[in-house]
Amino acid sequence: MNLRMTLATAVRVLGQLRHDHRSVALILVVPALLLTAVYFLFENEALPPGFPRTFDRVGLMMLAIFPFVMMFLVTSITMLRERTSGTLERLLTTPIHKADLLFGYAVAFSIMAALQSLVATAVAYWIFGLDIKGSPGLVVLIAVINAVLGVALGLLCSAFARTEFQAVQFMPVVVVPQILLCGLFVARENMNDALNGISGVLPLTFSVEALKEIAGNTEATAAMWQDAAVMGGIVVGVLVLASLTLGRQTR
């Protein structure tokens, strides 16, 4: 890998995103707006004294889910534009290595993912008073890893789409099952054996489990670090798969 080439690619992609106001809004503003909607859904709930708010549980999980979904969408569509416009094919004819190109894209989108997670977490804590035992810094860490996972999956799936509509069609296959089975709606121990088994290998499940550990403990636990490490390993694995499809032409 050539660090200079990687950074040059990242700077180019960030420059393109800077002029794409809709994508910037989708990344930075929309998750905060959706989190606002979640907060007001539970604003008037009647709870016994000392009983935790539903928002403290659901809103925390949304800090993992929203960045994941948004970064998957933005990355897959942006990467598809690079392919269909011929930009990617032209770059691959230059001396730049595939790994430099791929990680350049990943670095650029990951920077946006980190900004997105910081904005959403700040809104949750300092506007809506998210109340959990763990540190906000750990929440941001898991949110960022999850957003980068969305980036990696977006890079991979973009290779198998010919239009932006087809890129969006990957959501019901890649994103929605993870949201349904991650333990947000039904505790994993209450699922049947088949669904519980599937849930156990889905990346989003590990992020939800990590956030549960943060919510219930004042200090980082071994289980939380283990879940974070698994997520990091999945991100690396998906990026390797994405690099194998980088030269695939979209016609």
Regions found by a protein language model. Give the residues of each.
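Transmembrane helix-boundary elements of multi-pass transport/secretion proteins
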Residues: N2-L88, A99-S117, W126-V139, A143, ...
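Transmembrane helix segments
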Residues: A37-A46, A161-V201
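Transmembrane alpha-helix boundary and packing residues in multipass membrane permease domains
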Residues: Y39-F40, I77, T121, Y125, ...
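Hydrophobic transmembrane alpha-helices
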Residues: M62-V69, S110, V144, V148, ...
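Short helix-to-coil transition segments within interhelical loops
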Residues: R90-K98, F160
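Extended hydrophobic-aromatic, low-complexity segments
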Residues: G134, G150-V151, Q166-Q169, C182, ...
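Hydrophobic alpha-helical transmembrane segments of polytopic membrane proteins
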Residues: L138-A161, I179-C182, G232-L241
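Terminal transmembrane helical anchor/hairpin motif
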Residues: L184-A228
